[in-house]
């Protein structure tokens, strides 16, 4: 099993997004969401990764970044690490600066994306956001983004995952 920046449970995800949108008011809505989840998914609504990993005998490789603003590290990785850090089936890889969407990208990509983002912000300011269109965004990307640099994978992580799976089938 390879997990990349994943939530422990669907209710954790709902609560986290709800807290971003509604603040502490989500606490009053959570019982409703729990009931909706149970009505829609039955017994599956209460499943979570932590308990599933505990029952599994599979080897597990878990990636997460401390600065993930979509899925806070304490809602998954930290829980798994606390429970399984001493279990030889588990391998943990924690990053500090890869966010949620860039776990697989090299450090060069992160730097390049920051540069492109700064250029894009400047481009938007020059045009004026009121007049900005989707076509302009597409044109900017075509003219200014080197897709090979923008999407380059971290070869060490890819190698680590392949080796992990190779070791599992031996």
Ranges and model annotations:
Residues 58, 72-83, 107-108:
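Short alpha-helix in the alpha/beta-hydrolase fold that links the catalytic acid
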Residues 66-71, 99-102:
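Acidic catalytic loop of the alpha/beta-hydrolase fold
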Residues 81, 86-170:
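C-terminal catalytic histidine-bearing segment of alpha/beta-hydrolase fold enzymes
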Residues 55-57, 62-68:
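Short beta-strand/loop motif that positions the catalytic acidic residue
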Residues 54-56, 85-86:
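Short, conserved loop/helix-junction motifs that constitute active-site signature segments
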Residues 35-52, 58:
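Active-site nucleophile elbow and catalytic-triad environment of alpha/beta-hydrolase enzymes
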Residues 2, 61-63, 93:
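Hydrophobic/aromatic beta-strand patches that form the interior of the parallel beta-sheet core
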Residues 1-42:
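Hydrolase active-site cap/lid region
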């Amino acid at each position: 099993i390879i997990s990349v920046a994943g939530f422990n449970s669907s209710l954790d995800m709902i609560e986290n997004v709800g807290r971003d949108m509604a603040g502490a008011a989500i606490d009053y809505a959570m019982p409703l969401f729990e009931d909706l989840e149970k009505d829609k998914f039955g017994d599956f609504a209460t499943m979570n990764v932590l308990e599933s990993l505990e029952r599994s005998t599979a080897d597990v490789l878990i990636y997460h970044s401390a600065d993930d603003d979509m899925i806070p590290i304490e809602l998954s990785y930290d829980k798994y690490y606390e429970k399984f850090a001493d279990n030889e089936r588990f391998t943990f890889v924690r990053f500090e600066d890869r966010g949620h969407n860039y776990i697989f990208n090299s450090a060069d990509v992160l730097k390049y994306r920051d540069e492109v983002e700064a250029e894009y912000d400047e481009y938007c300011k020059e045009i004026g956001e009121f007049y900005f269109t989707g076509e302009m965004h597409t044109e900017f990307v075509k003219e200014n983004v080197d897709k090979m640099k923008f999407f380059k994978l971290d070869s060490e992580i890819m190698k680590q995952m392949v080796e992990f799976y190779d070791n599992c089938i031996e």
